[in-house]
Amino acid sequence: MISPLSVIILAAGKGTRMQSAKPKVLQTLAGKSLLGHVLDTCHQLTVDDTIIVHGFGGEQVQAHIAEQYAHLPITWVAQTEQLGTGHAVKVTLSDLPKEGQSLILYGDVPLVSCQTLATLQAANIYGVSMLTLTVDNPFGLGRIKRDKAGNIEAIIEQKDASSDEQQIQEINSGIYCVDNALLHKFLPKLSNDNAQQEYYLTDIVKMAVADGITIAAIEPEHTFEIEGVNNRQQLASLERTWQGKLVADLQEAGVQFADPTRVDIRGTLSVGQDVFVDVGVVFEGDCTLGDNVYIEAGCVIKNSQIGNACHIKPYCVIDEATVGAGVDIGPFAHLRPETVLSDNSKVGNFVEIKKSTIGHGSKVNHLSYIGDATVGTGVNVGAGVITCNYDGVNKSQTIIEDHAFIGSNSSLVAPVTIGDTATIAAGSVITKDVDASALAFGRARQTQKDNFQRPTKK
């Protein structure tokens, strides 16, 4: 029988060195809060209870999680005094089940992997397992003290370590998997009789050893998995490390980056073969790229699906759009939510499309706004065409049927339908439906005054 798993996330720190009114765990890395990373990772496991210990900015933290993770049942526990990590876990005891085991994690250590946590959980055979790492420079970190047989005896904090103990290079990450029964047994016994006058969570290791419990230790695959964030520099460094990992994974999947250090992935990116990504491209949310997609510099793509063989030219913004195969976009195009571009369509420079469908092979090449519209197959939309979809209160639909031709600088005042193969003369204001195959004019007749004299200065 699998032991029930609780997750305790310590998220009470203020993060003074961040110089921010926002709690540290709400700072963002790769477009997601630090705490959000931890929640997403641990809930890839089978978790029975989630307890978050909050402190500074607790209302902000709870509001953020309620908005982003409404589907997760979370127990919130306040740590009103910052008395150390041991005290932070201790305040959860009234909500922590007596049975099962708990992963103890940190809201400012965002990149521990699901695989590492699963291995840590599996290693907890005797009651306590912990994540450790051997580093070149252990200064400031808790040292793992082992006996002659190699068994863990204790964790010694930097300020309490002797000169010999300070030479130890194996350090404590602070991440544990502990039987709940042992937490209920050991945490009430913690003392703050140390240099920091804090209640150290690390003391439960010493207590477990005194009870004859063998402490299991594993190391993460990547050093960055245990790196915490205390200031802006560390946050920026961890951001670049994580982006490097994401880019490397995509390169292994066949993506070519013009410069792997100049791309940001702030979510999940699924890719086909032979994708090219130029410099300065940002992916946000859940994005999918088909085969042979070519994305030029400076584009922002958010929660969108891009079909095979699409070419996205520089500085386009694509937000919650679905793009078919063989589509050309940009430069400087803006696709807003609920835009659908069918196969082989084209959207050119300085075109904005919102909540509209552009049919197969249709073109909107220049300086146009298409909103709340359905555009059929083989339609040509000339430069400067505007669908006037808003009357100040309501949005209305524009329908342009197959093979229609919309002349430049025309305004289509919705609700309006342009029939199959209809032609709209340039400069028209169309306020009524246009029949199939008709030519519609909606402008004043041209007037010419011969020998006109311009005004002159007096």
From Swiss-Prot:
Pathway: Nucleotide-sugar biosynthesis; UDP-N-acetyl-alpha-D-glucosamine biosynthesis; N-acetyl-alpha-D-glucosamine 1-phosphate from alpha-D-glucosamine 6-phosphate (route II): step 2/2; Nucleotide-sugar biosynthesis; UDP-N-acetyl-alpha-D-glucosamine biosynthesis; UDP-N-acetyl-alpha-D-glucosamine from N-acetyl-alpha-D-glucosamine 1-phosphate: step 1/1; Bacterial outer membrane biogenesis; LPS lipid A biosynthesis. Residues 233-253 are annotated as: Linker. Residues 1-232 are annotated as: Pyrophosphorylase. It is an enzyme of class 2 (transferase). One of its GO terms (biological process) is cell morphogenesis. UDP-N-acetyl-alpha-D-glucosamine binds at residues 10-13, 24, 79, 84-85, 106-108, 142, 157, 172, 230, 336, 354, 369, 380. Binds 1 Mg(2+) ion per subunit. Its EC number is 2.7.7.23, 2.3.1.157. PROSITE patterns: HEXAPEP_TRANSFERASES. It catalyses: alpha-D-glucosamine 1-phosphate + acetyl-CoA = N-acetyl-alpha-D-glucosamine 1-phosphate + CoA + H(+); N-acetyl-alpha-D-glucosamine 1-phosphate + UTP + H(+) = UDP-N-acetyl-alpha-D-glucosamine + diphosphate. One of its GO terms (molecular function) is glucosamine-1-phosphate N-acetyltransferase activity. The keyword Transmembrane does not apply. Catalyzes the last two sequential reactions in the de novo biosynthetic pathway for UDP-N-acetylglucosamine (UDP-GlcNAc). The C-terminal domain catalyzes the transfer of acetyl group from acetyl coenzyme A to glucosamine-1-phosphate (GlcN-1-P) to produce N-acetylglucosamine-1-phosphate (GlcNAc-1-P), which is converted into UDP-GlcNAc by the transfer of uridine 5-monophosphate (from uridine 5-triphosphate), a reaction catalyzed by the N-terminal domain. Homotrimer. In the N-terminal section; belongs to the N-acetylglucosamine-1-phosphate uridyltransferase family. In the C-terminal section; belongs to the transferase hexapeptide repeat family. This is Bifunctional protein GlmU.
